[in-house]
Structures are given as structure tokens and as C-alpha cells.
């Protein structure tokens, strides 16, 4: 049986060499065995190949030996006549060669031939041959999806308790995040925790639940040694934003009660791709946008939200001169979604991925090579009409002030006096669509010089009157005429004292 299977394969392997040899110029005529050439001593001559075949039918075996002329070798590299064939009721095995009498051989046969053997594949067999590989591929794909899903579930699962074996020995048992931050701020560095400590914290955090998504990726609530933290997970295409935000957060002397507390930054391999983590303090109220959508605020609540926002921005904008000094920083994407509300009702500024720092010694601005732009709805007039001086750092600070004026308008609308308040709305909600273009905002803000409407009822409350006055002075078309963050902070501090509010 094995010899029979091998014989048909040998001519296929040698055909090219055989055909080439017979076509060489000057080659003599090839003598072959011919079973019909009785007059010529069973010999024939040819310029082509010697041929031998055996045909098996249901009742007999037919042998055939002869010469094949060169003209019949079609195609020349793999002649049809030399190929084995199978028809209903018969199977033919062939062999071609190019040496004298090389076809004087007996080709092996498979024995008695049955009709069933030659019939080829039936419909059931054909279906099985086709369905088999398809099922195998489907099962393989399902297995891959299952494995990937399990990896994700394992990575994001919520264990009953954290594995203490994951902690590294240099963070002693019982140490809290407050202890680590306190040690960092009193050690004199003021530029964030050591990288090894950051990595240790990040890699021993247990993710609990997803609490938000954005263009950068998503935010998770996590736990480290029982303390809740926020984990901002950037997608790999947002690596520049992750690196920039981590870099800004670790600026010397940046830590402030009204700026989101940075804990750690790390890149983690979750088994299928690399995640970029930024770990910070967790604030259960979420963003100011979410908070104002859910709740109205009292006069005291309004002042606390506004004053803490102004305090955070004033600290960002301020340059601290000294050995451990801090450069002035402009946010460039200030809005209610990038401000978080703390448990005590005050705010902290977050999302510093677009921030720029000013080096007063060289008067240069380190504008990050980042493809993102600020939020169009909150862009200042000079940003919308492209007249902003990108080489002048004060220009960026003034654009922040304009945006903060819009945030104050959002807060003041939710201030309830005598049960009266406005529904929450985004600035310019009545003038532009939900996702306005730069051109639509430029037409409203720069050409028509429109600003958010200030309700008449605000004039009946001193606190709302002060807030309205601050807003108008933040919205001037001329950036140089706008208030500074420090001036706004002082005005609101005086207002809080008048209202008897303790911050």
C-alpha cells in the first residue's frame, strides 16, 4: 500500500527536471519500452518522454507502456499526460521518465478495485471535510475570547481582602497614605513620593469599580490598605497626556488642599496591553458638574465652592521663588468637569494634562507636545479668534480666569434662596448646540459678544450680587482687564467673612 502511494508522487517531483533534460539542444532520441511495438522489438524512439501507466477497474488491470512526443507535453513543466487520474470506476497511475527503457517497470497496484473507492467524496463526507476546519477555527476563537475575558475579570476582580504579600517591605505595616504624604512634604523635596514607593503603591492597589469614562480612558475607585483612592487609567494612545499630567503633579511645591492630591503614576501590563495609571485622592462626590446636576447649594455652599476653586487656581498661577520654589502654572482646560468636590463641600482642581509651566528665569513656557485642545465651550475670546499671544504666559492665566467665571455662573445658578433656583445648565446652553464647534463659539463670544445670562433674582442677594460682579469682570473681551485669581480669592474671602462662613 505504501509503495503504491509513493509511486504517483515520484513523477510529480521529477517532471520539471525530466522535461528540461529532454529539451536540451543536441540531445539524442530517447528509446522507450513500447508494449504495442512488436515489430520493433517492443521499442520506440521519441524526442519527449517514456511513459508507463496502470489502470485499475472493478474487474481488471490494464498496463500501458509507450513513447510521448515532445509536442504532447502540455504544459511542459507539468504535462497532463504524466499526471495520475481518477474517474468513476477506474484509477490510473502514471510514470514518466527520460532514460532509455526507463519505463520498462511494473507499477504497483492496490489490488481489487471497488466502485466505492473511486466514487470520491459523497455529500456527507464533503460536508464533514468543510465543516471540520470551520468548527476548529470557531472553537479556537471562542477559546481565545474566553481566555482574554478571564484575564480581564481576574485583573479587575474585587477580592475579599487585599493580598498583604504584594506589599514591599520598605513600606512598613500600618503606614497610611497620609503618613507617606506627610513624610514627603516635610522632607523638603515637595516633588512627590519616590518612584519606587509610587510603583509599590500602584501595584498593590485593588480596583473596585469603574466610576467614570472620558476621552483619555476611564477612572476607577480602588483600595490600598483599606484606603480609597482614584485610579485614572489612560489608554495607550494618550501616553503623552498621562506623562504630562504626572510630570505637572510632581512639580515642586504644587501640593495644595484645593488641587487634587497626587499619589502615584505607573505603567502596568494587564496581560493584553499596557495600562497607564495615575493614582490620586478619591472624592466620592465626583466632579463639580455631577455635583451641581444632583444638588442645589446654599449661599454658604456656593461661596465655599467658588472660594476653594479660586484658591486652587491662585496657587497654580502663583510662582514661589526659592531653592524649593514652584513655577507659575496655567491650567488651560478649566471647567466644571475638571473640578472635584470634596467631602467637606470645597473644591479641588484636577486634570492637569494640558497645563503649562512658566520659567521666569528664561521667560519660557513649556507647552506640552500634546494633540489635545481645551474644551471649546470654555475657550476665552482670544483663544477662539486665535489672537492669543502664545509666548506670553499671562495670556494663559487670563484664559483660565475667563473659564473660571463660567464655572462660577454654573455654581450660582444652583444657589437656592427661598426655594428658588435655576436648573443646572452648561454655559451658553441657549446659544450653541451641545457640542459646539470653534466657529460656533467664536461667532457667539467674539462677534456677537454675548455672555451667559445673569438672572434678575441675583440682585436680591448680596452674595449673588458679588458673584455676578466677579463673573462680569472675568468675561471681559480684553484679557488684560480681567481680575487675577488672587484678587478673586481675596474678594470671596471677604464675602465669606461677612456671611460668617468658616472654611
UniProtKB/Swiss-Prot annotation:
Q: How does it assemble?
A: Homodimer; in the endoplasmic reticulum but also at the cell membrane. Heterohexamer; TGFB1, TGFB2 and TGFB3 homodimeric ligands assemble a functional receptor composed of two TGFBR1 and TGFBR2 heterodimers to form a ligand-receptor heterohexamer. The respective affinity of TGBRB1 and TGFBR2 for the ligands may modulate the kinetics of assembly of the receptor and may explain the different biological activities of TGFB1, TGFB2 and TGFB3.
Per the record, ranges on the Extracellular side are: 30-126
UniProt short sequence motif FKBP1A-binding, positions renumbered to this chain? 193-194
Reaction(s) this enzyme catalyzes, per UniProt: L-threonyl-[receptor-protein] + ATP = O-phospho-L-threonyl-[receptor-protein] + ADP + H(+); L-seryl-[receptor-protein] + ATP = O-phospho-L-seryl-[receptor-protein] + ADP + H(+)
Task: Tell me what this protein is called.
Answer: TGF-beta receptor type-1
What is one Pfam family matched by this protein? TGF_beta_GS
Describe the family membership recorded for this protein in Swiss-Prot or TrEMBL.
Answer: Belongs to the protein kinase superfamily. TKL Ser/Thr protein kinase family. TGFB receptor subfamily.
What membrane topology is given? Single-pass type I membrane protein
Q: Which range is the signal sequence, renumbered to this chain?
A: 1-29
Task: Provide the transmembrane region boundaries.
Answer: 127-147
Q: Where is the active site?
A: 333 (proton acceptor)
> Gene3D superfamilies recorded for this chain?
CD59, Phosphorylase Kinase, domain 1, Transferase(Phosphotransferase) domain 1
**Which part of the chain holds the cross-link Glycyl lysine isopeptide (Lys-Gly) (interchain with G-Cter in ubiquitin)?**
268
Q: What is its EC number?
A: 2.7.11.30
